[in-house]
Amino acid sequence: MIRALVAVTALALLSACTPAPAPSTAPRTELVVFAASSLSDTYTSLGKTFEGSHPGVTVKFSFDGSSTLVDQLKQGAPADVFAAADRPNMTKATTANLMSGTPSLFATNTLTIIVPKGNPAGITGLDSSVDGKKLVICADGVPCGSATTKLAKLLGVTLKPVSQETKVTDVRAKVESGQADAGVVYVTDAKAAGSKVDTIAIKNADQVKNEYLVGVVATSKNSNLANQFVALVIGSEGQRILSDAGFTLP
């Protein structure tokens, strides 16, 4: 009996001293997505959807002006997927052999004006009502800026903005914070701002559309996953998310 008790005690002590199994340290696969700043809300949502269906994968985003992202790719910045807010910037990327295969058109977007709640400056459109007001637009080198310039020319309006931003989300932020009387943004940004702003339609805005394209970066180290992410964007789930955000589907 004593021997049995000693044996049981020894076994218990041995079990207590045995280290617990080490937690899994398998590294997660990181998928790097470069995307236009106007896609920040929708692509963040798409990233969560993708991670949910791909255990062990983390989607890392870099949101910026499309032209800035192309420059970064040219300089060798590592990325797996690139989504541009207009065709000219994607063309720059493909011409420089930065993309693998043919990028896919997945959405279009148009411009509108946002103003602080109540429209205290009395803005009526992209017209003389913005003269002398604190108007903020995108810089001409980025898609929303190029579209703004085209639309202003179409309407015969000369704009004198107090600030030109490299990201459309920065234009939105300045209106939301009351730093600007009006800002020219995409309709998707106006929808994302919600009750923080009022929206003023721009005449003939539907005549100046920006096309959004997405593709796999040529130097991607995760091209299979990158292609699957692109498939999500252009598939039914991705298109639903984009449509809900206000994008027009191709």
Question: Which residues fall in each region the model found?
Answer:
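Acidic, polar ligand-binding/catalytic clefts
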Residues: P88-M99, S104-F106
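Exported/periplasmic ABC-transporter solute-binding proteins
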Residues: C17-G52, S67, D71-K74, D86-R87, ...
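C-terminal motif of bacterial Sec signal peptides marking the signal peptidase cleavage site
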Residues: A12-A16
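Periplasmic-binding protein-like
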Residues: D80-A84
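Short, high-confidence coil segments that cap the C-terminus of an alpha-helix
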Residues: G56, P78-A79, A180
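Extracytoplasmic metal-acquisition and chelation regions
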Residues: K74-P78, A107-T108
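Bacterial N-terminal signal peptides that target proteins for export
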Residues: M1-V6
